[in-house]
Design a protein with these regions (language model features):
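Catalytic alpha/beta core domains of metabolic enzymes, predominantly
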Residues: 131, 142-250
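Short, flexible micro-motifs
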Residues: 14, 48, 53-56, 85, ...
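C-terminal alpha-helical cap/extension of soluble enzyme domains
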Residues: 2, 8-17, 34-37, 41-43, ...
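Secondary-structure boundary/capping positions in well-ordered alpha/beta enzyme cores
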Residues: 77-78, 134-135, 163, 185, ...
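Active-site beta->alpha loop and helix N-cap motifs at the rims of alpha/beta catalytic domains
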Residues: 2-145, 155, 298
Length: 298
């Protein structure tokens, strides 16, 4: 599925890692080149300012420029920025910034400064939807402590606040219940290591991590999975899964950046408080990435 006018969140949208220089400053030139390279290698778009993009440790000026850089590189239709913030008003301002920069959609976590109840979640998404740009919800109950269960997602969609959901709970059973409750709500794969399961359950897109390092093979995996070519999909999934599972680990940013370095891309360091991988972790990721390269998956 390629980018479409009305549902640009479909297909493979890469939650982009952010290149930093030796002084941990954002390297916008390398980031622009990375966005272009991803599209050239078959990805449908990018998601800047997600957790993989280290948005939590960016200044407001840096965060805004990251969006502008992506739009200048590949066009706003292909850019779906994360607009998460502690307050709804701030999230709305980020949605307005994305809209004004030319983005066609945004991705929004629920309130995450505290464990919000259903009424607060509804109010949060209503406020940000008021910016006038389509909103893709992001369900990450592991980190936010707010679970956008299928019944709540159906309410959010029914009110017109969201158009799709990035599902990171890991519970693939929810896909079927969500399809029953809100058949027009697009389900997006939110964790790399449940790609095949959610693709078979009807997912319309993938907000992806490991295409940062291995875009062509990851895109081939996604296309085969959603297209019903299970022979191709299962083989690729088995080959890539030793890496894909790192997307669901605490060290996912460091892991994906290391794999980028191994394949010759600019991964590099992370800003504090993220610390370098332990030697034994680095060895596992490096070996798995080198094995993928040797298998022709890079």
């Amino acid at each position: 599925m390629t980018v479409t006018e009305h549902r640009p969140w479909r297909g493979v949208l890469v939650a982009t890692a952010l290149p930093l220089d030796d002084n941990l400053r954002v390297d916008h030139g390398k980031y622009a080149e990375h966005c272009s390279w991803l599209v050239e290698n078959g990805c449908d778009g990018v998601v800047p300012n997600g957790s993989l993009g280290e948005y939590q440790v960016l200044t407001p000026e840096e965060r805004a420029k990251v969006v502008e850089t992506a739009v200048a590189a590949i066009g706003g239709t292909r850019v779906m920025p994360g607009v998460a913030a502690y307050g709804s008003a701030e999230s709305r301002r980020w949605a307005e910034q994305a809209r004004d920069a030319g983005c066609a959609s945004v991705m929004l976590l629920p309130p995450n400064a505290y464990r919000a109840d259903e009424r607060s979640v509804l109010a949060h998404y209503e406020e940000v939807a008021g910016a006038g740009v389509p909103v893709v919800a992001y369900n990450n109950p592991i980190d936010t402590k707010v679970d956008l269960v299928p019944e709540l997602l159906a309410k959010l969609h029914g009110e017109g606040y969201i158009r799709a959901v990035k599902e990171f709970s890991g519970d693939v059973r929810r896909a079927y219940q969500l399809a029953e409750l809100a058949p027009e709500l697009d389900l997006l794969i939110g964790a790399d290591d449940v790609l095949l399961e959610l693709a078979l359950a009807g997912a319309k897109g993938w907000v992806a991590g490991y295409p940062n390092a291995l875009p062509r093979s990851c895109v081939e995996l996604y296309r085969a999975a959603v297209g019903g070519d299970l022979g191709t999909a299962k083989k690729l999934y088995e080959q890539l899964h030793p890496l894909l599972r790192w997307d669901s680990k605490v060290e996912f940013v460091q892991a994906i950046k290391l794999s980028m370095d191994v394949v010759g891309r600019h991964g590099g360091r992370c800003r504090p408080p993220r610390v370098p991988l332990l030697p034994e972790q680095e060895a596992v990721i490096r070996a798995a990435t080198e094995k993928a390269v040797a298998a022709g998956l890079a």
